[in-house]
Amino acid sequence: MYPESTTGSPARLSLRQTGSPGMIYSTRYGSPKRQLQFYRNLGKSGLRVSCLGLGTWVTFGGQITDEMAEHLMTLAYDNGINLFDTAEVYAAGKAEVVLGNIIKKKGWRRSSLVITTKIFWGGKAETERGLSRKHIIEGLKASLERLQLEYVDVVFANRPDPNTPMEETVRAMTHVINQGMAMYWGTSRWSSMEIMEAYSVARQFNLIPPICEQAEYHMFQREKVEVQLPELFHKIGVGAMTWSPLACGIVSGKYDSGIPPYSRASLKGYQWLKDKILSEEGRRQQAKLKELQAIAERLGCTLPQLAIAWCLRNEGVSSVLLGASNAEQLMENIGAIQVLPKLSSSIVHEIDSILGNKPYSKKDYRS
């Protein structure tokens, strides 16, 4: 059995913090808990984001009701989370509508929120997708209308666009920032070379470079965030905002006995995830997760909490985006912050030994 202390009084983190602390609340017990500082700079920018953010992929406007979305967002905000991420493509724009309605209804100060959206797949027309100047400007305008906001804090290019010159994309991103439609811009699913090219173009033409890459990062996907992005961070200041810390639920342990009903892998359009889980590699991963479960029990936490804390222990990660379909999941995930101080070097080494997939940079080979 897991201990009931998942959402109890949190420990203070040894993170480099200077901003206002968030307040951890336990809705289960009703009383505000000790203040906890858990904000980090997004890359080398001055933007302070909570080390955990709430994503809206699959859930908002799709898997969950609008009422549940409001409940989850309120829980997140009350627990100090200030980062909320969406995209024009999520639920064909409905995720942005739901998010915008909640912000308007709750009356939260806009200046207390960090809202991010992603542009690439807008509509079915040829001109409604990609990273052309036309779609970046029109797509972001449409997103802002759905969100009922004057600006987003970060607009992301949701994937690279080989059909558009890099200079055009960087100029368009600079334009929307100069027009007050966004504060910063970033990339998602871009390679290190593509990010470096965008930075070089920005420097060459006195434009605004990206500050962050959104990348998939979890125990079974490590190379990009642990080897490639740290080099970019040190060279040009691009940070990492990571998503899918539980590998679409694989790391949660929920699939160790097959595909449960109402899980993401059971949804229409997620046959790829089901196939992945039931594959030979998927079975090997489940065996490793059983070993990791023993470490989680030793630390007094759940497997999802261990997995999220493991992502947070990476100093190059500015924020980890969470996905949740109910309040229990969200509060459990937020409880990962309490596990972070317990991840000693020996525990991390033990986890690496079980996973057997630690990537090595050129520096590691030289030393």
UniProtKB/Swiss-Prot annotation:
InterPro entries on file: K_chnl_volt-dep_bsu_KCNAB, K_chnl_volt-dep_bsu_KCNAB-rel, K_chnl_volt-dep_bsu_KCNAB2, NADP_OxRdtase_dom, NADP_OxRdtase_dom_sf
Residues modified as Asymmetric dimethylarginine: 28
pH dependence of function: Optimum pH is 7.2-7.4 for the NADPH-dependent reduction of 4-nitrobenzaldehyde.
Secretion signal span: none
Posttranslational mods: Phosphorylated by PRKCZ; may be regulated by incorporation in a complex composed of PRKCZ and SQSTM1.
Catalytic activity: hydroxyacetone + NADP(+) = methylglyoxal + NADPH + H(+); (E)-4-oxonon-2-en-1-ol + NADP(+) = (E)-4-oxonon-2-enal + NADPH + H(+)
Biological process according to GO: hematopoietic progenitor cell differentiation; myoblast differentiation; neuromuscular process; regulation of potassium ion transmembrane transport; regulation of protein localization to cell surface
Active site, UniProt feature: 90 (proton donor/acceptor)
Keywords: Acetylation, Cell membrane, Cell projection, Cytoplasm, Cytoskeleton, Ion transport, Membrane, Methylation, NADP, Oxidoreductase, Phosphoprotein, Potassium, Potassium transport, Synapse, Synaptosome, Transport
Localization in the cell: Cytoplasm; Membrane; Cell membrane; Cell projection, Axon
Expression sites (tissue/organ): Detected in brain. Detected in the middle third of the molecular layer of the dentate gyrus in hippocampus. Detected in neurons in the deep cerebellar nucleus. Detected in globus pallidus and pars reticulata of the substantia nigra. Detected in cerebellum. Detected at axon terminal plexuses of cerebellar granule cells. Detected in the juxtaparanodal region of nodes of Ranvier in cerebellum (at protein level). Detected in mesenteric arteries.
CDD domains listed in its UniProt record: Aldo_ket_red_shaker
Record-listed E.C. numbers: 1.1.1.-
Predominant place of localization: cytoplasm
Single annotated GO MF: potassium channel regulator activity
Ranges that cross the membrane: none
Entry GO CC: axon; axon initial segment; axon terminus; cytoplasmic side of plasma membrane; cytoskeleton; cytosol; glutamatergic synapse; juxtaparanode region of axon
Modified residues (Omega-N-methylarginine): 28
Bilayer topology: Peripheral membrane protein
Residues annotated as binding NADP(+): 56-57, 63, 85, 158, 188-189, 214, 243-248, 254, 262, 264, 323, 325, 329, 332-333
Function field: Regulatory subunit of the voltage-gated potassium (Kv) Shaker channels composed of pore-forming and potassium-conducting alpha subunits and of regulatory beta subunits. The beta-2/KCNAB2 subunit promotes potassium channel closure via a mechanism that does not involve physical obstruction of the channel pore. Promotes the inactivation of Kv1.4/KCNA4 and Kv1.5/KCNA5 alpha subunit-containing channels. Displays nicotinamide adenine dinucleotide phosphate (NADPH)-dependent aldoketoreductase activity by catalyzing the NADPH-dependent reduction of a wide range of aldehyde and ketone substrates.
Quaternary data: Homotetramer. Interaction with tetrameric potassium channel alpha subunits gives rise to a heterooctamer. Identified in potassium channel complexes containing KCNA1, KCNA2, KCNA4, KCNA5, KCNA6, KCNAB1, KCNAB2 and KCND3. Interacts (in unphosphorylated form) with MAPRE1. Forms a ternary complex with SQSTM1 and PRKCZ.
Entry-linked NCBIfam families: Kv_beta
Protein name in UniProt: Voltage-gated potassium channel subunit beta-2
Source organism of this protein record: Rattus norvegicus (Rat)
